[in-house]
Amino acid sequence: MEIIRPMRVAIVAESFLPNVNGVTNSVLRVLEHLKANGHDALVIAPGARDFEEEIGHYLGFEIVRVPTVRVPLIDSLPIGVPLPSVTSVLREYNPDIIHLASPFVLGGAAAFAARQLRIPAIAIYQTDVAGFSQRYHLAPLATASWEWIKTVHNMCQRTLAPSSMSIDELRDHGINDIFHWARGVDSKRFHPGKRSVALRKSWDPSGAKKIVGFVGRLASEKGVECLAGLSGRSDIQLVIVGDGPEAKYLQEMMPDAIFTGALGGEELATTYASLDLFVHPGEFETFCQAIQEAQASGVPTIGPRAGGPIDLINEGVNGLLLDVVDFKETLPAAAEWILDDSRHSEMCAAAWEGVKDKTWEALCTQLLQHYADVIALSQRIPLTFFGPSAEVAKLPLWVARALGVRTRISIEA
């Protein structure tokens, strides 16, 4: 294996602590790997909301915060404002490479800054923004979103995508230089041995029911309402883990379900392992780490035949994929098939066997090799200056106007 020299890595994250989600979790694992292997890092991320505690360092790495705004419909996810100072911070830190975690607003500004400063950049595709636009009845923004995503990612030397479907979708929309980079899972933390008889008894004192669960943000794009088809049954107990804007609506829809709120650490690991079946209906998941964590816990999974779950679920072996259009209607029969005693234990074993070697150590080692490859390539082929006008002209007018002002300011910063 090639020995990688110590690097200075600037990570610009569209989301970060105290917000906990897929983007944040993957950035944390990358930072931990960088620290353990002698590299230096800086994080630029949105600030916390007024009622949340904001941390300024993680593992000794500085976190530079930018102001945030909240967008209607998804106001639980603060959006970082791409100030001109982003360019100044990157210039002063002078990284070997810039890692853009799910770039869109803040990451888009950083992509422009990287070209201006002639610093190589890698974009990590993690969020289906166009899909979210459609789910929130903002379909006209979907096309504009793809134009912007294409611009941002094609300014980077490499795009890393987590699944075969996301790679195909990116290529279909004109994104170049795409490589596959999945996600690791902590198979020591998420493990079948964490199963708790006591926890299961607290959910179902009779001990007669099968426990079916969901873990994730309680928001429209996750499709949690599809689980309502399993509600009110005498043989199934639903357990919904997470919080979000649709929590109250879902509680009213499924009054007999147990809603735990957001969980983390060992409490979350024990919850996963204590399920009999995990269901995630979200059709806009570029990867779906929750499915992988459930599998590491020895739990069969049901997901949509869309996005990341297609790569994670081996139908009939560790779970089932259901068509998006009739997911809710077909879920009860699919759940009954998996929970049947004649096949359930075999599928539990297959779930764990399929992911036990997909460690974050292995995945982050791959990532660092991508860093090294891009740095080496940029040294052989110097980056050209990329002024704002060439790309701004290709954008939707509303984006071009805003970006034109910000880009010109950032050049002077």
From Swiss-Prot:
Pathway annotation from the record: Phospholipid metabolism; phosphatidylinositol metabolism
The entry's keywords: Glycosyltransferase, Lipid biosynthesis, Lipid metabolism, Phospholipid biosynthesis, Phospholipid metabolism, Transferase
InterPro entries: Glyco_trans_1, Glyco_trans_4-like_N, Glycosyltransferase_grp1
EC top class, as a word: transferase
Keyword Iron part of the UniProt annotation: no
Enzyme nomenclature, EC number: 2.4.1.-
GO molecular function: mannosyltransferase activity
Pfam families: Glyco_transf_4, Glycos_transf_1
GO cellular component: membrane
UniProt GO BP: glycolipid biosynthetic process; phosphatidylinositol metabolic process; phospholipid biosynthetic process
Alphabetical list of PANTHER family matching this protein: SULFOQUINOVOSYL TRANSFERASE SQD2
Role, per record: Catalyzes the addition of a mannose residue from GDP-D-mannose to GlcAGroAc2 to generate 1,2-di-O-C16/C18:1-(alpha-D-mannopyranosyl)-(1-4)-(alpha-D-glucopyranosyluronic acid)-(1-3)-glycerol(ManGlcAGroAc2).
Protein name (record): GDP-mannose-dependent alpha-mannosyltransferase
Organism this protein belongs to: Corynebacterium glutamicum (strain ATCC 13032 / DSM 20300 / JCM 1318 / BCRC 11384 / CCUG 27702 / LMG 3730 / NBRC 12168 / NCIMB 10025 / NRRL B-2784 / 534)
Source lineage: Bacteria, Bacillati, Actinomycetota, Actinomycetes, Mycobacteriales
